[in-house]
């Protein structure tokens, strides 16, 4: 099973590169980075926070009636992925233009979609505030956004057959005497 966290983060980065700026990169938390091109968008994270209200200790059973089988596993844990977004530009005017693109992105995209599911995209702290980092001539603005309820499954999976064997016994209606036993699995 592919990583759901990886899929949703890759989908977010690709969408930001297409809609905001092609100079969008993902950097891990507590990593020192160097801005190589402006304008740029640094996506710092994700920082995971579990959604404990959705925690469930029961087993999840999925039945495949066509194949007469079942799959039993624990319910997934749901995590919120928090990202810090840092916009960087050469001038204040270019930063304001980039801020507008970033804000419009989050207004236009309320969810991030992968091949299997879609996840809500929530604004925690809007992008804003002009800052001058490290006494350089670059301008920066930052904000925080969240992707909610990303599923993470454990690897404890039990698969089995619903029906272990099937025998059909054909009997004479009047005497109840066995005429034939039919085994479709053989």
Q: Which functions belong to the PLM regions below?
A:
Residues 1-7, 17, 54, 70-72, ...:
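Compositionally biased, intrinsically disordered low-complexity segments enriched in polar/Pro/Gly
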Residues 1-63:
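Small/polar-rich, solvent-exposed N-terminal microdomains that initiate assembly or binding
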Residues 18, 96-99, 103-162, 170-172:
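Acidic-leaning, charged glycine-interspersed low-complexity segments
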Residues 30-32, 70-75, 127-135:
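Catalytic micro-motifs at enzyme active sites that drive phosphoryl/nucleotidyl and oxygen chemistry
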Residues 85-95:
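A generic structural motif
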């Amino acid at each position: 099973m592919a990583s759901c966290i990886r899929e949703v983060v890759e989908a977010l980065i690709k969408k930001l590169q297409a809609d905001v700026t092609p100079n969008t990169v993902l950097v891990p938390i507590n990593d020192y980075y160097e801005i190589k091109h402006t304008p740029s968008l640094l996506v710092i994270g994700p920082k995971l926070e579990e959604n404990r209200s959705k925690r469930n200790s029961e087993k999840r059973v999925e039945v495949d009636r066509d194949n007469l089988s079942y799959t039993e596993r624990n319910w997934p844990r749901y995590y919120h992925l928090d990202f810090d977004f840092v916009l960087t530009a050469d001038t204040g005017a270019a930063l304001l233009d980039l801020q507008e693109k970033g804000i419009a992105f989050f207004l236009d995209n309320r969810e991030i979609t992968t091949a299997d599911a879609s996840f809500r995209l929530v604004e925690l702290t809007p992008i804003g505030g002009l800052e001058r980092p490290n006494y350089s001539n670059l301008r920066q603005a930052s904000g925080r956004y969240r992707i909610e309820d990303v599923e993470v499954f454990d690897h404890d999976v039990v698969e089995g057959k619903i029906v272990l064997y099937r025998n059909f016994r054909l009997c004479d209606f009047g005497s109840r005497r066995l005429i034939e036993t039919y085994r479709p699995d053989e």
